[in-house]
Amino acid sequence: MSDLLVFPGGGRLPVKDDRDLGHLLPRSAAGDLPDKAYQHWRAPPALDQGKSSTCVGHGCHQLLRASPVRNVKNIPDPYQIYNEAQKIDEWPGENYDGTSVRAGVKYLAKQGYISSYKWAFDGPTAVNHILTVSPVVIGVDWREGQMSVDGKGFIYPKGRMIGGHCVLVVGANTQEKCPDGNIGSVTLLNSWGPKWGNKGRAKLSMKAFDELIRANGEAAAVFETLKPQEAPVVS
């Protein structure tokens, strides 16, 4: 099992800074979601971060390779993204494990892969972006109930707090009935290898997704660009 990202300074996720490229997305109420009920973006096979704390690097790397804008040639590997993110994140030095989603997407923007990024502070706002624009990179609390996937393909933010973790949210289905009775789910692409969950993926109810983001989570809604050296890949 891969190590979780443990954030410096007590394990809390950093406050979003909307002074650079990042700004707040307009909030979307659950009733304001688009008529489109389902979207699942194509993504590469799940990576495995091993025993490292490089989930931000892996999540951001998988974002680059996922549709709708798929940068697949000469892109920075997960460890390069992680190392560069540590240099520009909220904490001094680099002698610690982990970094922030903010630093990861900020590095991708500096490299020209992202034209802008905005922050979603709740589940419906993030889901709206997933349904209409692209996957979302999140950094959220991770509990015992999220360590393994049940028979229905779901994880649950219950039990003892383990730490913080970054994953890529590649899909949303506003009409799926979840095992806990809630309606609506999102699909996460983890970086614990293809043997975890459903080929490295798991589902989370939209209710739980909303609670995780509101609990001081990071949800980066990005607007990607295709690097000049890239040949477009049909999604």
What are these regions (language model features)?
Residues 1-235:
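Catalytic-core signature of thiol
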